[in-house]
Amino acid sequence: MELQELAKTLTMAPVSFLEFSLALLCLAVLYYLHVRSRRKNPLIPLDWPVVGMLPALLVNLPRLHDWVTSLLSTTQLNFRLTGPPLSGRHLFFTSDPANVRHVFTSNFPNYPKGTELAEIMDILGGGIFNADGDSWRRQRAKAQLLMSGPRFRAFVSRCSRLKVERDLLPLLDHVAATSTGGVCDLKDVFLRLTFDMTATLVFGVDPGCLTVSFQEVRFARAIDDAMDVLLVRSVLPLSWWKLVRWLGVGYERKMTVARLDIDGFIGDAIAKRRDAVKAGRVIEDDDEDSADLLSSYIDEDDDAVDDVILRDTTMNLMLAGRDTTGSALSWFFYLLTMNPRVESKILAELDTIKATTSTTLDDMVTYDPDELGRLVYLHAALCESLRLYPPVPFEHKGVVAAEALPSGHQVRPGDKIVVSLYAMGRMEAVWGEDCREFRPERWIGEDGKLRYVPSYKFASFNTGPRTCLGKDMAFVQLKVVAAAVVRNFEVEAVPGHVVEPNISIILHMKNGFKARIKRRRQVMNS
């Protein structure tokens, strides 16, 4: 009899579980319909009892940038996204210039980077990006002293022009002459170019990433892998990815391998530079003294700075220069292919300055960086591209003490403030009704000179005390590359190839940028 009762219970259990599950589902549907009917704005995600707004975030993750833009557009530039109660993921999104000015400048000490971000970005060590307080101030003062000096500025100009003339133009000329119809991935080309340029400026070494063979460089591959892992970490709760790291599996295993390659390359560069400085040897590059930042740090402090500090410093500088400039160039040329009117104006402006014709590159030309610095429309076009496609689409800040922001929203310790620069460039309240148009003229005043735009409105180079130290260097590189490519080649987007932002820490293109390259045949100034 007992066996029969037990059998009866077991056969009924699945039915009871099914009924229970259906009841839960019905309750969830009723809750959804009830909350939805009371929402004033249907675009705002539902805040579920246990998971918060996490389901909406996960569903919209593939189009995160445009989703956040639509939310901020419909919520007057500010929106609070709540995560699961114990996740620590309570994010306050903003694209309000007044809030940006307050957080990044007016009350700067109350909004540090925070220890959690430093843990996520541990590949950067104690470098300037992770540092707060006195450590950050010391590092910034030292970097500013070296990067603002005339010797380094001249080094940037010379290396940028030489790299374009020796490697970029010949490679594009080779692509244009190939049987594949002159098609290449310009995103890949520009990332390789800026990797070599940045490594030269930071380490005094050209890794040779930009070659006709498109060979893989382990150091470059390692940085790409590390960036992929950092994105995963930034989305997951701290305890989750730390457990995966402790287990040494999955993406964290990839980070371990990447760190070994990164530390190996940088360690070798540091050792060689120390030996050269101690031996009193002149580091030469085209018979001129090299002014790379690593040599300058070692020469300034000799043995006072240890290898760990040098490793962290150079890694931060490398990351700052390589991906951001490569991303900016990719989006700039994509926008030019969509707006031939702008390209024509840039070509006309280039005709007003002197070009240098190469005797070894089939009459292709390059430009002196100082001459390019006088061009207004080229600078405006680059700013307009950076407005629409900022290389760093999000800026993150922690909160020390509770207070009300200029928008009236309250923030508390534990909150994460996320500034969407991508969304800010698409806000009518900030840039007007034509905010989504690529229109360089918005940067030019009636007097024909560049119009002043406050950095808290155009924050592609950050704003406040943390304003990017490499801003001038970046514009030199962008202009040297843009002018040479526009003048010597016609760039056409391959029809049917979809270009859209990737979900990454740097605003890369999801599918790359397939473009057809053709030599431009016409009379040019010389």
Question: Where are these predicted regions, by residue range?
Answer:
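Cytochrome P450 heme-binding "Cys pocket" and the immediately downstream C-terminal segment
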Residues: 340-342, 417, 471-508, 512
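Conserved cytochrome P450 K-helix/beta-meander segment immediately N-terminal to the heme-binding cysteine loop
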Residues: 389, 419-449
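Cytochrome P450
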Residues: 2-27, 82-92, 151-162, 173-200, ...
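Cytochrome P450 heme-thiolate "Cys pocket" and heme-binding signature region
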Residues: 145-146, 320, 443-478, 504
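Central I-helix of cytochrome P450 enzymes
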Residues: 194, 198, 203, 258, ...
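Conserved cytochrome P450 K-helix E-x-x-R motif and the immediately C-terminal K′/meander segment
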Residues: 54-79, 264, 268, 363-407
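N-terminal membrane-proximal hinge/A-helix region immediately C-terminal to the signal-anchor transmembrane segment
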Residues: 2-138, 159-166, 258-261
